[in-house]
Each structure stands twice: as structure tokens, then as C-alpha cells.
């Protein structure tokens, strides 16, 4: 067996010039690691800390579209992301890994999903993975409060327009979820000579309603009918009796620790033994490496139709795929293997951003982050040509106000919006138009500012998940409170607005303090945190009136 580097280089050389169009599931993977500062005792509740290792594009189609360029195949992902910072990061990541993003968009009606993969120890102390899409209503995804995926639509001739816009015929079309639009695009591309690769983990088995389950299964079979290669796992698709109805396909079923098997046309199933990696660290992405390496291998073998395939060559291609997938589990993260390759150069991730006519800045509450539920709500209702900056505030108050003043000097925002702790800082940024929502003017009394260690409740850009308030920092908060109104000017009195929740039991009393220094006070019916409908009804009109 060739060394892994030789295998990869061989694939790159032979697959050079081949193309793959792909659509389906994309997510921003948040790779985290849990550590145990006091050690780990099996069966006990152990104190732990969590930190973010990195954040990057993932999920099945996202991985395949970024793994294939590493193996020599040019990719063209089709994706509709939103205009959140995470949505733009996905577009940049795709470009950075070598994908052509001409069919990727960032719009208000797009969707962005975040997915946490946490490396932990299970009850016995063995390494394990925990997956999560959202937590206690906290936002882990784009402009929505739950996973938000937007696929190519069948409406208004969108599929035909996309097909007509292609100035090349892709060698492979990859999709990973049952959608009518994906099936329709496959139907348009196959007659042109494109090989269609369909990977699925859902045939409707989990749907409780029998009518819905049958409808999902029929939709799955329609996708199979319009595909050439169909890949699935034995865990998700244990019953493979349907394959006997198709005689012009290649079916691939992964078997976990038992390897992989395939059925080509009318041939019987052939099982290939697994390739184990004794240096296992993370299985995340192994299945996607299997798909990517197999696609690259058949591209290199010029085996881009089922009619050209033989069981011998399919076996060879799958063994190459298994070898690369086995190697990949020796690294943390689905694309850890690429990160570790010092000789592989990532691409420039610069993308064309919108031309903004207004620039706003949002400052968050304590123990939070700039990109939080409230900023999501604001961004959701802002005009598309208005930019929203979402910096993460620092735990040290003096360092934080200094950082914010420097940022304002650099960015020159048209408006600053601060909530709770953010309102405390915002009203001190003299010389700018500001809205302070339930400002915490006695911030040193906040439970999140007490002396000791605290956890950030939302992921931050720097990946740090905890902070410590020292006695000196607590004194600095008190000192800042005492002088917070010293810089108020006549301009500030007219251009710093207070917006207070009538049901705010946390800092509602600060309205009287605020009104002693500023001239404009408004209220909304809610509590300390604004709901989306309150943002739309009360905050957005105020923003537009001020700007």
C-alpha cells in the first residue's frame, strides 16, 4: 500500500481538471474541547472547562466541497447563506479551501446553521463526541433561533436558470439531501454526461406519520432513480431491499467498524474490510473523506459513468477512499488533515461584500457576545445596505471602554446600540448617536460582574468561554460608575436615547437615573431582553428615525 502522501498526490495529479457541482447541507462547525482542570474520575461529576478550537465550514456537502479541492477536483458549491457574520464566514471558508463561490449567495432570505462538536470524556473516561445545534434557546445559527437551511428552490424556474447559467458541464454533481430541486437539477445534468452522486442519511424512517413517511420514502426513491451513485450508512438505511429495483446504479453502504460494501449494477454485494488507525482522535468527517476520495479516485480513473465501472476498479477506488478516511481520523476536526499539511497552501478568502450606506454598532450584555440573540434580531430587520458591527466586549472595564473608543474612531458608526452592560458602555461613548436599551448603570451589582470565575453564555469570536473578575477589576467597575456621566455634552443630551422595558425587573430603575442626564426616553411593553417582535415594533423605527 502506498504512503498516504503518495496516494493524495497521485489523486491530485490524475483528477486535475475535473469538476464537481454540489449542493445540500452546509454548516459552520464549532469544534470545542472539554478539559478537566482537577483531573477526571470515572462515574463522578467532574469540573470542566470548554474552549473553542476553531470554527469553519462543515456538514456533508460543506465538507465534500472543501475536501475535493485538496484532492485535485475543482468544486462549485450551490448555497444560500444569510447576511450574518457566520453566513459570510461560510462563504469565505469555501473560497479559502479552493471552491469557486460563483453560485454561493449571502442574502436576508438565506439560511445559516451552526453545529457544535464537543470533544469530551464519557462516564468511563473514554473520548467521546457531543453534538448540538442549539442550547436553551441561545442562538447557534444565523438569523434564526433554530437550524436554518435554505436549499435551491423549484419555484420560478430557478433550477432551469441555474442549469442554463453553467458555462461548463460538471463531471460530477453531488447532493446530500432529498429535495425536489436537487432531483430536478440531477435530471437536467445527467443527459449531458454528468455523473450524479447522491449521499443520504434519511429515507423518512424517523417520521411518525405513516403518510408522511411514505411520501418521504417515495421522494428518496425519485432521487435514487435520477442518480448514478448512491451512498448511505447501515445505521441510517439498514433495509437495502430497494436496491434490487435498480440495475444501472452503484450503491455504497458504509458498515462502521465492519468496513464498507458496494453493489454495482446486477452484481452481488461486495464487502471490503476496514482500515483501522491506531492513532484515532476524531471520526468526524471520515464519511465525507470517503465520499471525497472516492469521487477523486473515479475522476482520476476516468470512470465517470456506471457503464465504465467494474467491480475491480470500484474496489480499488473504495480502498483508496478508506485509506484516506482512516488517515483523517488521526486529526481533530473534519478537515484537520488539511490543517496539518504544511505544504498545502490555502486560497485567499477575500469575498465581495455589499456596499453599505449606514454603519451601526451593537454592544452586548454581560457574559454574552456581540453576535447574540438581540443582534440577530436587529440584523434581521435592518435594510440590507446597513452594516451591523458586533464586537465582543472585554471583561476588564477600562480595557473595554478604551477598545470601544478606538473602534469607534476607526469605524465611525452612524449609530451605537447598547443593551444592558452594552448600554452602560454605549452612553459613555460621547460624540456619537446612541440608543441605550435597559442600560445597567449600576453594573458592579450585576451577578456576572461579581468577583470570581464566570462562563460566557454565547460563543465569542476569540473562542474563549470563561472570564475572571478580580477584586481590582470590580473596583474599576465601581470607579467607572462614579464618573460615567462626566463626559456628557449638549450633543449627547440630544443624541443619546434611552429605551426601557416596562417590565424590566433587573435595571428598570435606571430609567430615572438616565433621564436626569439625557432628553429622550422611550419605553416598550417587555422586560429586560427585547423579543424579536419588540425589536421590529419599537427599536427599528427608533433607529430609522434617529439615522
Where are these regions (language model features)?
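Glycine-rich phosphate/adenosyl-contacting loop at the front of the ribokinase-like
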Residues: 2-78, 82-96, 279-280
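A short beta-strand-loop structural module common to alpha/beta enzyme folds
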Residues: 51-58, 78-79, 384-400, 523
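Conserved N-terminal subdomain of the carbohydrate kinase-like
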Residues: 42-52, 70-172, 193, 344-351
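Gly/Ala-rich beta-loop-alpha elbow adjacent to hydrolase catalytic centers
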Residues: 417-427
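Conserved beta-alpha-beta core of the PfkB/ribokinase-like small-molecule kinase fold
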Residues: 171-246, 250, 259
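Conserved phosphate-binding/catalytic region of the ribokinase-like
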Residues: 2-17, 241-354
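The alpha/beta-hydrolase serine catalytic core
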Residues: 433-547
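Active-site catalytic motif of lipid deacylating hydrolases and related acyltransferases
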Residues: 354-410, 528
Amino acid at each position: 500500500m502506498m504512503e498516504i502522501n503518495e496516494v493524495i498526490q497521485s489523486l491530485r495529479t490524475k483528477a486535475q481538471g475535473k469538476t464537481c457541482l454540489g449542493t445540500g447541507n452546509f454548516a459552520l462547525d464549532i469544534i470545542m474541547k472539554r478539559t478537566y482542570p482537577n483531573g477526571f474520575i470515572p462515574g463522578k461529576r467532574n469540573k470542566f472547562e470548554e474552549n473553542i478550537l476553531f470554527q469553519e465550514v462543515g456538514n456533508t456537502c460543506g465538507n465534500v466541497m472543501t475536501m475535493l479541492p485538496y484532492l485535485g477536483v475543482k468544486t462549485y458549491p450551490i448555497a444560500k447563506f444569510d447576511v450574518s457574520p457566520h453566513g459570510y464566514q461560510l462563504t469565505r471558508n469555501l473560497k479559502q479551501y479552493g471552491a469557486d463561490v460563483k453560485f454561493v449567495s449571502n442574502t436576508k432570505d438565506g439560511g445559516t446553521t451552526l453545529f457544535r462538536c464537543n470533544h469530551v470524556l464519557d462516564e468511563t473516561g473514554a473520548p467521546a463526541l457531543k453534538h448540538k445545534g442549539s442550547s436553551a434557546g441561545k442562538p447557534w445559527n444565523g438569523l434564526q433561533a433554530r437550524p436554518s437551511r435554505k436549499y435551491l428552490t423549484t419555484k420560478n424556474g430557478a433550477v432551469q436558470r441555474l442549469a442554463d447559467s453553467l458555462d461548463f458541464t460538471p463531471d460530477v454533481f453531488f447532493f446530500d439531501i432529498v429535495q425536489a430541486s436537487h432531483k430536478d437539477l440531477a435530471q437536467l445534468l445527467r443527459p449531458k454526461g454528468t455523473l450524479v452522486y447522491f449521499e443520504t442519511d434519511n429515507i423518512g424512517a424517523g417520521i411518525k406519520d405513516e403518510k408522511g413517511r411514505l411520501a418521504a420514502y417515495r421522494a428518496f426513491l425519485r432521487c435514487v432513480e435520477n442518480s448514478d451513485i448512491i451512498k448511505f450508512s447501515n445505521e441510517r438505511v439498514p433495509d437495502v431491499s430497494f436496491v434490487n429495483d435498480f440495475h444501472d446504479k452503484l450503491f455504497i453502504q458504509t458498515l462502521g467498524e465492519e468496513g464498507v460494501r458496494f453493489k454495482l449494477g446486477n452484481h452481488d454485494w461486495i464487502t471490503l474490510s476496514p482500515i483501522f488507525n491506531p492513532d484515532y482522535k476524531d471520526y468526524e468527517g471520515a464519511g465525507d473523506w470517503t465520499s471525497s476520495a472516492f469521487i477523486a479516485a473515479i475522476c482520476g480513473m476516468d470512470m465517470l459513468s456506471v457503464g465504465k465501472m467494474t467491480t475491480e476498479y470500484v474496489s480499488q477506488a473504495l480502498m483508496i477512499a478508506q485509506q484516506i478516511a482512516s488517515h483523517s481520523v488521526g486529526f481533530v476536526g473534519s478537515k484537520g488533515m488539511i490543517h496539518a499539511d504544511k505544504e498545502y497552501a490555502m486560497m485567499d478568502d477575500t469575498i465581495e461584500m455589499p456596499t453599505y450606506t449606514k454603519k451601526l454598532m451593537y454592544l452586548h450584555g454581560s457574559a454574552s457576545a456581540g453576535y447574540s440573540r438581540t443582534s440577530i434580531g436587529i440584523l434581521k430587520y435592518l435594510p440590507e445596505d446597513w452594516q451591523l458591527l458586533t464586537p465582543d466586549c472585554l471583561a476588564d472595564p477600562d480595557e473595554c471602554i478604551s477598545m470601544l473608543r478606538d473602534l469607534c474612531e476607526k469605524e465611525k458608526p452612524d449609530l451605537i446600540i447598547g443593551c444592558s452592560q452594552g448600554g452602560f458602555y454605549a452612553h459613555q461613548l460621547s460624540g456619537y448617536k446612541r440608543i441605550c436599551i435597559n442600560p445597567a448603570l449600576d453594573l458592579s451589582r450585576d451577578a456576572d460582574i461579581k468577583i470570581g470565575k464566570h462562563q460566557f453564555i454565547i460563543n465569542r469570536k476569540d473562542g474563549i468561554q470563561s472570564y475572571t473578575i478580580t477584586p481590582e477589576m470590580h473596583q474599576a467597575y465601581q470607579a467607572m460608575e462614579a464618573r460615567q456621566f462626566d463626559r456628557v455634552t449638549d450633543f449627547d443630551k440630544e443624541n443619546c436615547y434611552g429605551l426601557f422595558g416596562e417590565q424590566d425587573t433587573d435595571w428598570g430603575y435606571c430609567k430615572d437615573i438616565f433621564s436626569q442626564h439625557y432628553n429622550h426616553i422611550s419605553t416598550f411593553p417587555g422586560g429586560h431582553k427585547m423579543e424579536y417582535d419588540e425589536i421590529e415594533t419599537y427599536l427599528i423605527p427608533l433607529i430609522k428615525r434617529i439615522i
